[in-house]
Amino acid sequence: MSIVTTSFDMMSQKTGTTHDKEMLISGLDHVNLLVPPQTLHLAYSFYASTLGLAPAVVPASCKAHLAWFHIGNSGQQIHITSQHYLSQIQLKAQTESPRHPCFKVPSEDKLNRLQRLIWALYESGGEGAPVYCDEPGNDNAGQGAAGDFPKRFFARDYAGNRLEFTL
């Protein structure tokens, strides 16, 4: 058994290992998000209609509890799983979790438009509306006084999944 020791240099933000090794991971294929049972129609509404992600083909045997969406032409996807066996405690923990995917938006104009769109849906409420969105025009996304972070905002979909949008 071989043990690999890693280090992280905060100044250069480079990770070093004690031996050279070929890169084994070439990218990220998908991120899976959970939603309550019987709500895949809301996932299609939010992720396809609001965010503009293109639905992908799901295996026929899984259509009742899965929805997949392409993220542009990147080859990456968002998978949505409707789990009938999730307890209310598990669903509550999900809605309070800081874990999140971060979506890259091509321009500041489109980022601002998307934030206004999600904010309007949040404000309107109702079934399928986001349960949270950073208010447009406020520095509530943690930009920091020094501008340490790129322009971004956070929202939570109708099921409480935390989502980040950035340049």
Residue ranges of model-derived segments:
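N-terminal beta-strand motif that seeds the catalytic metal site of vicinal oxygen chelate
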Residues: 2-44, 101
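A short, acidic/glycine-rich surface segment
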Residues: 13-15, 64, 85-90, 138-143
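Short glycine-enriched loop/turn motifs at secondary-structure junctions
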Residues: 26-27, 94-98, 146-147
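Helix-adjacent hinge/juxtasegments
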Residues: 80-83, 87-105
